[in-house]
Amino acid sequence: MNNYSNLALSKSKGRIFKEANSLYRTPFQRDRDRIIHSASFRRLKHKTQVFVNTEGDHFRTRITHSIEVAQIARSIAKHLGLNDDLAETLSLAHDLGHTPFGHAGEDALNECMVNFGGFDHNLQTLRIVMFLEHKYLKFKGLNLTLETLDGLLKHNGAIDDLSTVNRLIGLKSFKNKINFNNSGSLEAQISAISDDIAYNNHDIQDGIRAKMFNLNDLIEINFFKDIYKSHKNNIKNNNKDILIYQIIRDSIDLMVRDLIKNTKNNLKNNKVKSLKDVYNLDDPIVCFSSKFLKIEKEVRFFLRSKMYNNKKVLLKNNHGKKIINKLFYKIKNKPKKFLNDDQLKNDTNRAIADFISGMTDRYAINLNKGI
């Protein structure tokens, strides 16, 4: 086990608004706790991952997904000697900006906002933690550490288009405390790829539960076939539920093992000795080997063909899009009926997008019925 603690973001450079340090929690632990106690995090319980929240109690929602991502990210960061609190914090926060009805809802809201700056769920997460959560007297938002803000900004890698960040958040809001040119920290990269590991594997579990495909379909992928063969004779009465759980469990474990091994190789091959080296590299350091990149591609293709493009899912997505579209223009027609003066004092269209994106599936459905 190699220790890369010298590459960890172990100390914080502070926050946008100065605060006294806690006597018993690190700045990153405070960030995590602020996220967990936020209204936006609680609402993730009733937001779609793939299946609308009303479809069943056992399907994953945004909150269960975020917790699973955080668990994977924390384990990886801890093994590498990095800041596991920060990796966990970024993972818990990464989906705060998601709309109701998943990516379909985001697409619909972006279409509504196309002439008003657009909508992006990653940047909406920043809007939430910087402006929209109201819990403190001296500032809006959660006033998270600069390292957490930086990691959320770079969830998908280095920033390619600063104009979008400026349009949706405002570069001045960061008060020159963020370096927009750097690549993301190792903790940010770990959080991002843990997101991929979690949803690729857990969507398989949910897809089988929803009977969109079965175990025989899954083991057409050689990666899963090999795992299946290693377990099928050891499961009493060939219990399929346990067998599927063991397959997903081993899949996650194998992906994490490959990721850690390949990350160590990348650190060595790129002669990464300091945080500055991490920031200056254009390509991600935390990534799969070529073998597992191919496996990931196969898994994504499988899920897209069997699940995401399933007729039932597409119908639900289209219904969700219609709800978002209707809500946007109904609220736009009478904004004062739904939003207060403080929300409307700047950009009405952005305020409507903030309002709709913060809705749960259930709230959006019920509001649509009564509007």
Swiss-Prot record:
Matching SUPFAM superfamilies: HD-domain/PDEase-like (SSF109604)
Pfam family, one: HD_assoc
InterPro entries in alphabetical order: dGTPase, dGTPase-like, dNTPase_2, HD/PDEase_dom, HD_domain, PHydrolase_assoc_dom
GO biological process terms, semicolon-separated: dGTP catabolic process
Disulfide topology: none
Record's keyword annotation contains Repeat: no
Gene Ontology MF annotations: dGTPase activity
Superkingdom per UniProt: Bacteria
Keyword Hydrolase: yes
Sorted UniProt keywords: Hydrolase
HD domain segment(s): 62-200
NCBIfam families in the cross-refs: dGTP_triPase, PRK01286.1-1
Family membership noted in the UniProt record: Belongs to the dGTPase family. Type 2 subfamily.
Protein name: Deoxyguanosinetriphosphate triphosphohydrolase-like protein
Taxon lineage: Bacteria, Pseudomonadati, Pseudomonadota, Alphaproteobacteria, Candidatus Pelagibacterales
